[in-house]
Amino acid sequence: MLAFLILVTVTLASAHHSGEHFEGEKVFRVNVEDENDISLLHELASTRQIDFWKPDSVTQIKPHSTVDFRVKAEDILAVEDFLEQNELQYEVLINNLRSVLEAQFDSRVRTTGHSYEKYNNWETIEAWTKQVTSENPDLISRTAIGTTFLGNNIYLLKVGKPGPNKPAIFMDCGFHAREWISHAFCQWFVREAVLTYGYESHMTEFLNKLDFYVLPVLNIDGYIYTWTKNRMWRKTRSTNAGTTCIGTDPNRNFDAGWCTTGASTDPCDETYCGSAAESEKETKALADFIRNNLSSIKAYLTIHSYSQMILYPYSYDYKLPENNAELNNLAKAAVKELATLYGTKYTYGPGATTIYPAAGGSDDWAYDQGIKYSFTFELRDKGRYGFILPESQIQATCEETMLAIKYVTNYVLGHL
């Protein structure tokens, strides 16, 4: 056994070697009351390098909301002076980002093998997709639906008992590279499917009657970059013509109101929509797969973080979907079910009004393809840790999310 347990010391330097160290950086939360406050934050963002965590961009700030953003150490005093001089109410969520990053891992001594209760790098996840498939050939098959900009295979797991013409649910994780709890959930879902099939009645029924297409990591290149260079990286790693700025926001790259609102045409921005809809190899691979399997896919679930929300269309427009009442009731019930385990409170509603307008999202695109049950899950937390959710919260987060996913699945199964 010891021959297979190679222990390595993991520190921030080794997990993110030769990259950003984040020493002394802070995460602020500002209370925004009115348009004047919004204008002030626009002014701040134009003069300082601000990394917006929630919302994703300064352009998405709304009155009567809170705004979370990261500030580099050398800009801290200037930002604090600006906030105080303009009487903007704020608090510091994270006082030293490096310290929180170091504490994210439960232990500095880690096994090199896969663990469902720890964050796994892409090399480990890739090996896991092969292993979990080979160990469960009667439940799981693996295919590569495309490659990333840097040539990594985009693996999709088909989870379910083999059968003809089965309806399916598509679920993806890892759109935004820094949202590590998202990646962890797709792995946890597969774990639950494997462990509880034949023992737990709902999962057994689901896998007998449905297939789950599970995409563990879409933005593989970006995810690798968060482990090797910059933990706060969000976008893909594709090059852009005419600039040294790298990457596109994959969740602004779908042909759903593409680049009309809540998205940027500037390749240097975190919400850059790309040179065209589906310009990214990753989003094109996902969209092609769904288009090719549209007759069987009955629900689309995309997992993100953070803010504890279940969202449904639309985000690119304030219009409501045709089955708004049904989606609202389903989201409400799923949120209630989720809270039964640990009391975690989620909000729910249409994306544009519940969180912020954002064009080019995969959930809106899937809905417009005719998949009428389309949801975005924004997992824990509400900002205490933000994208740096500790490993100690992986299990609880995944367990409660499973309740909501299973509730939605059961509903979809009953409304085919």
Swiss-Prot record:
Pfam families: Peptidase_M14, Propep_M14. Keywords: Carboxypeptidase, Cytoplasmic vesicle, Disulfide bond, Hydrolase, Metal-binding, Metalloprotease, Protease, Secreted, Signal, Zinc, Zymogen. GO terms for biological process: proteolysis. SUPFAM superfamilies: Protease propeptides/inhibitors, Zn-dependent exopeptidases. CDD domains: M14_CPB (cd03871). The active site is at residue 378. Binds 1 zinc ion per subunit. It catalyses: Preferential release of a C-terminal lysine or arginine amino acid. It is found in: Secreted; Zymogen granule lumen. Residues 16-110 form a propeptide. Residues 118-412 form the Peptidase M14 domain. GO terms for molecular function: metallocarboxypeptidase activity; zinc ion binding. Substrate binds at residues 176-179, 234, 251-252, 305-306, 356. Residues 1-15 form the signal peptide. Disulfide bonds join 173-186, 245-268, 259-273. GO terms for cellular component: cytoplasmic vesicle; extracellular space. Its EC number is 3.4.17.2. The keyword Metal-binding applies. PANTHER family: CARBOXYPEPTIDASE B, PROTEASE FAMILY M14 CARBOXYPEPTIDASE A,B. Belongs to the peptidase M14 family. This is Carboxypeptidase B. The lineage of its organism: Eukaryota, Metazoa, Chordata, Craniata, Vertebrata.
